[in-house]
């Protein structure tokens, strides 16, 4: 696979399932526009999007309940969505799957550090030389529960630093903890 030329210099919203995804809805209701919207996993069953990133094998949703509340919405989406849905392996039961260009992205970035779906989407943006990334719903830890945090924040922040270094503008939802965006100035 080669980079997608039409993405070069474009503004992309990447929307995950964390609480700050509501900031995406607010942005849209206030007429913010994006050249493309990329959905992470089950968010694709809720919002209009151009691409889906799901780095789990489709069998996780088709054959098990391992994804909990995401299972049913992903099951329907995978069987009907025409793509592109970037994933780690193809499955003939899902017409829209495209194998994520892992070799190409790793070779381009000279880096193997990818451990969650959002990081793969950010790395894909870097590889495609987008002009701006606006992130919503990538919240990895939560102010109301100091003892819980999802894995993957450091990896996403690492890839965002690589994007910034490459001249890509990075904007984070105001209520997200990513890059400490939601930390009050007095803290």
PLM-predicted stretches and their roles:
Residues 1-187:
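Metal-ion/cofactor- or nucleotide/acyl-coenzyme-handling active-site neighborhoods
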């Amino acid at each position: 696979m080669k980079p997608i030329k039409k993405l070069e210099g474009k503004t992309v919203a990447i929307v995950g399932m964390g609480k700050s995804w509501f900031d995406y809805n607010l942005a849209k209701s206030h007429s913010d526009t994006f050249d493309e919207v990329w959905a992470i996993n089950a968010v694709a069953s809720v919002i209009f999007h151009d691409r889906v990133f799901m780095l789990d094998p489709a069998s996780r949703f088709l054959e098990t309940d391992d994804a909990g509340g995401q299972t049913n919405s992903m099951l329907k989406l995978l069987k009907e969505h025409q793509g592109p849905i970037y994933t780690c392996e193809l499955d003939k039961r899902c017409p829209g799957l495209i194998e994520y260009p892992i070799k190409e992205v790793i070779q381009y970035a000279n880096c193997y550090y990818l451990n969650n779906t959002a990081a793969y989407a950010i790395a894909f943006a870097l590889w495609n030389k987008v002009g701006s990334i606006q992130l919503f719903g990538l919240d990895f830890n939560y102010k109301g529960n100091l003892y819980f945090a999802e894995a993957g924040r450091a990896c996403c922040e690492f890839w965002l630093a690589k994007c910034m270094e490459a001249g890509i503008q990075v904007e984070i939802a105001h209520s997200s903890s990513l890059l400490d965006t939601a930390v009050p100035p007095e803290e």
